[in-house]
């Protein structure tokens, strides 16, 4: 069934919001002071992001494709898998969804933001940074991580077995994200998604959070550009080797 564009955009909006609630919500639970999950560990965060992708793909994959990621949308368009006419509306819906999702995380954890004095921990609940402050490493990590994500997701959801059992394919995509966060999350987070980084970073800059420190706009282009580059390569690999 082909849904109207408004319905597809609604799916992208709510899907991206859910991604933020599960993903950055899990970071807030681990990093912010005096939460029930304080210091619960990296696996808790990886699980949050895995579920944060899995559930929207299960819920909205048949409606909009559940891109929930501007890099995925642009990459599919560049490689002829998605109409260019829908790219800008999809990206706007994703950006607004990320904004809403992060705002919900902030409101939910508001008392703990006030109690937390670690500026890096606070920033980490909004956006990515490079653990070693090396921009080249930051770019490469985000590029390769998104390449694997997009290549893996397209293989799961577009090949014959995934089309026959979309629910199973969606679950596997969630595990790909879970695995990527555990394996490639050390250097940068990772972001793997321009909307997941840009809009929360904007909120971090705007919101009156005590002890929040810098929003680090000097490196903010990296988790926007690098995922797009990686996604385009990942989608190209899928088209070259498997799409016929």
Language model features by range: what are they?
Residues 1-244:
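Membrane-interface helix-loop junctions and terminal tails of multi-pass membrane proteins
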């Amino acid at each position: 069934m082909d849904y109207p564009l408004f319905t597809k955009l609604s799916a992208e909006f709510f899907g991206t919001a859910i991604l933020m609630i599960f993903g950055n919500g899990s970071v807030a639970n681990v990093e912010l002071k005096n939460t029930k999950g304080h210091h619960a560990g990296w696996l808790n965060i990886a699980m949050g992001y895995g579920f944060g992708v899995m559930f929207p793909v299960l819920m909205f994959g048949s409606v909009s494709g559940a891109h929930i990621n501007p890099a995925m949308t642009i990459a599919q368009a560049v490689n002829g898998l998605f109409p260019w006419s829908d790219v800008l509306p999809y990206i706007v819906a994703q950006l607004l969804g990320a904004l809403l999702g992060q705002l919900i995380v902030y409101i939910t954890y508001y008392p703990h933001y006030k109690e937390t004095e670690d500026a890096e921990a606070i920033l980490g609940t909004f956006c990515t940074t490079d653990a070693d402050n090396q921009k080249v490493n930051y770019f490469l990590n985000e590029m390769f991580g998104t390449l694997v994500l997009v290549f893996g997701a397209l293989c799961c959801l577009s090949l014959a077995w995934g089309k026959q059992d979309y629910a199973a394919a969606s679950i596997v995509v969630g595990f790909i994200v879970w695995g990527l966060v555990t394996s490639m999350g050390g250097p940068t987070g990772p972001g793997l998604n321009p909307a997941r980084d840009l809009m929360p970073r904007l909120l971090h800059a705007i919101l009156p959070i005590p002890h929040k420190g810098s929003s680090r706009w000097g490196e903010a282009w990296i988790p926007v550009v690098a995922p797009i580059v990686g996604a385009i390569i990942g989608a190209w690999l899928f088209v070259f080797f498997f799409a016929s």
